[in-house]
Amino acid sequence: MSTTLGTKLKLTIFGESHGVAIGGVIDGILPGIKLDMDYIEAVMKRRMPGQNDMSTPRKEADKAEMLSGVFNGITTGAPIAFEIRNSNQHSSDYEKTKNLMRPGHADYTGYMKYKGYSDYRGGGHFSGRLTAVLTFAGAIASYILEGANIFITAHVLSIGEVIDENLNSMTGSAQLRDKLKQMELPVISEEKEIFMRNLIQDAKSNHDSIGGVVECAVTGVPAGIGNPFFDSVESRLSHMLFSIPAVKGIEFGDGFEMSKARASMVNDQMSIIDGEVTHKSNHNGGILGGITNAMPIIFKTAIKPTPSIAMSQNTVDINNSSDAIIEIKGRHDPCIVPRVVPVIESVAAFVILDMMLDESPEYIKSRWSL
């Protein structure tokens, strides 16, 4: 089982949805950084369940306890170990259906991989519950990046067929960034927000769920970060983004739309402005040859509908190898997309900080006076 990721900055995760706790170990955080716990807890709160009618009613405090690596609020350079206690499990919801493989979940694949020994309650180690660990680690990374004037902004680009405005030229707007972080459904267009909420409520009332797309922008990363081929910026980001259980697709810049265009339309032409190389457009999403060009890194992430729905579905009983019908009980999200937004921001922050510490550590150190 692969539970560690990173190069200079490493994250190891542990735990299961209905176990005692989930948590992680972050190795590689620079010493001497005074952490702002209010900042970190605000990021965690945006992911937290049970806050509105678009989310599961399961309530978890998502309060992380740091066990090492921070002393008097300042990083020591030692690994930061932390845990988040699970406090609101309804494990009995899963007893009657433990032999039924839930469609859209990792029940069957996990059963085959781990010979039936994996914890089936709430998805166990496969659960989106573990994104709380990714979010906490990424919130620390995001705080450090912001101290170096690198900012990450994400929003819900679409729910179903309803599409919000793109970030585009607004990516560097502190006002927009702050606004989105305060919203239950972080979208740019207030009109589209109404339609999205209606779609989510319609799915909920029909015992169904709905997916969408999250758009994310990273600004302030200097040119020259990344590598060609196997360690491209796209590869590194995608590797960790796909650790989010609901993610099923990623595109950078104009992505698949570029396949319909001509080069004259999507080549990001350049000029010198105030002595600096500037791109006149950003169709490639701030990355060329796997390396940053100082334009905003733009990517979109496809989020599938929450697979736990109360409708009757065909499945199999793995114990007696027979067909079966399952109706999933429990507390589930009619749309997970809004809660995924801070997770994607956090994952992006962790990867970007890892790359910066690997290739340009002085850039971070100098801005923190380390």
From Swiss-Prot:
Co-factor(s): FMNH2
Keyword set, alphabetical order: Amino-acid biosynthesis, Aromatic amino acid biosynthesis, FAD, Flavoprotein, FMN, Lyase, NADP
Residues involved in FMN binding: 125-127, 289, 304-308, 331
Residues at which NADP(+) binds: 47
E.C. number: 4.2.3.5
Disulfide bonds: none
Annotated metabolic or biological route of this protein: Metabolic intermediate biosynthesis; chorismate biosynthesis; chorismate from D-erythrose 4-phosphate and phosphoenolpyruvate: step 7/7
Catalytic activity: 5-O-(1-carboxyvinyl)-3-phosphoshikimate = chorismate + phosphate
Keyword Transport: no
A biological process term (GO) from this entry: aromatic amino acid family biosynthetic process
Gene3D superfamilies: Chorismate synthase AroC (3.60.150.10)
Keyword Ubl conjugation: no
Cofactor: how and how many bound: Reduced FMN (FMNH(2)).
Enzyme class: lyase
PROSITE patterns, sorted: CHORISMATE_SYNTHASE_2, CHORISMATE_SYNTHASE_3
GO CC annotations on file: cytosol
Subunit structure: Homotetramer.
Family the entry assigns: Belongs to the chorismate synthase family.
The protein's name: Chorismate synthase
Organism: Acetoanaerobium sticklandii (strain ATCC 12662 / DSM 519 / JCM 1433 / CCUG 9281 / NCIMB 10654 / HF)
Lineage, highest ranks first: Bacteria, Bacillati, Bacillota, Clostridia, Peptostreptococcales
